[in-house]
Amino acid sequence: MQISAKESFFRHQCLLFLDIVNGSIYERELIGILSGDMKQVEKFSRAVPPERKESVLGLIRHPFFVTRSAGSLGADVVALRGDLSAIIEVKSSISDSIMFTEASGKRQEQATRMIKRLEASGTFLMYAYRLKGIRGEAWKTFAAPANPKGKIAYLYDFLPKLDTTRENNFYLKWERGKPLSEFIDYMNRLQSD
């Protein structure tokens, strides 16, 4: 069955809308976890390995201050706690990899722009990637290339880096990320020293 160009365009727009809506759902989920929302933290804690469950539940007592970033020029989420911060770009997909050159290369441009902006501040851009439709812990974390200064450099060294293609374009491979529960546990240990 042949569909018209108009119908094809409409279907494409609907898929884009659903992706945007779903993306914001997962962004709110991450914000709820990091900000210590009891319902979100308890739900997330059921998916993490037993050895990290206590660390995750500790977010209820010792949460991050989390805010959403406005507009498309900044990262999605900024999480602050004590003397550490995380500038986070949230990604979600049913695919286990995300190529930054997809969507007309806008992801690549955004990442490059953010990396340059954060370089002067001595911090780095972090990616939180949620794989849709998976049982268990669905969030993985990554760091964009940087040269951070101070205590935040320990966190940077702990996180796996974005992969790059031969053409130096970024991509995320979900299985190579560090589970969000490990990120939380490591932040707790960094701040207890």
PLM features: residue spans?
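Nucleic-acid nuclease catalytic cores
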Residues: I115-K149
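Short amphipathic alpha-helical segments and helix-helix/interface helices
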Residues: I31, A111-L118
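A short catalytic or substrate-binding loop motif that flags glycine-/basic-rich loops and adjacent residues
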Residues: S69-S72, A120
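Acidic-basic catalytic patches of nuclease active cores, encompassing PD-(D/E)XK
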Residues: M1-S69
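Active-site beta-strand-loop-beta-strand hairpin of nuclease catalytic cores
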Residues: G71-S92
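Intrinsically disordered, low-complexity terminal regions enriched in charged/polar residues
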Residues: G136-D193
